Amino acid sequence: MKLLPREKDKLLLFTAALLAEKRRNRGLKLNYPEAIALISAVILEGAREGKSVAELMDVGKNVLTRDDVMIGVPEMITNVQVEATFSDGTKLVTVHDPII
């Protein structure tokens, strides 16, 4: 299977997000890369499902709470930017302060 670099990046992101989700379900607190991966994957999947940029900006704020991540992670993640493919093209989705 031949993948473009962008496709490889998405595959790596989803692999990290699956691992993060499993760890969260086991009660482990997520670190910085795991939190970014999980939020990003939710945004990408939402775009695939047909949600709008505005909807995904709201969804991105409800993926994780402070209780889900290690100490200091919410302060490290001031925003998450994901380039997602929508039915009408590729758009940048920015979620400000995603971990409440």
Curated annotation (Swiss-Prot):
Keyword terms, alphabetized: Cytoplasm, Hydrolase
SUPFAM superfamilies (alphabetical): Urease, gamma-subunit
Catalytic function, reaction form: urea + 2 H2O + H(+) = hydrogencarbonate + 2 NH4(+)
GO molecular function, one term: nickel cation binding
Record's subcellular location: Cytoplasm
UniProt feature coiled coil, ranges: none
Keyword ATP-binding carried by entry: no
One Pfam family hit: Urease_gamma
Pathway noted in the entry: Nitrogen metabolism; urea degradation; CO(2) and NH(3) from urea (urease route): step 1/1
GO BP terms in the entry: urea catabolic process
Subunit structure: Heterotrimer of UreA (gamma), UreB (beta) and UreC (alpha) subunits. Three heterotrimers associate to form the active enzyme.
NCBIfam families xref list: PRK13241.1, urease_gam
Protein name as it appears in the record: Urease subunit gamma
Native organism: Blochmanniella pennsylvanica (strain BPEN)
Gene name for this UniProt entry: ureA
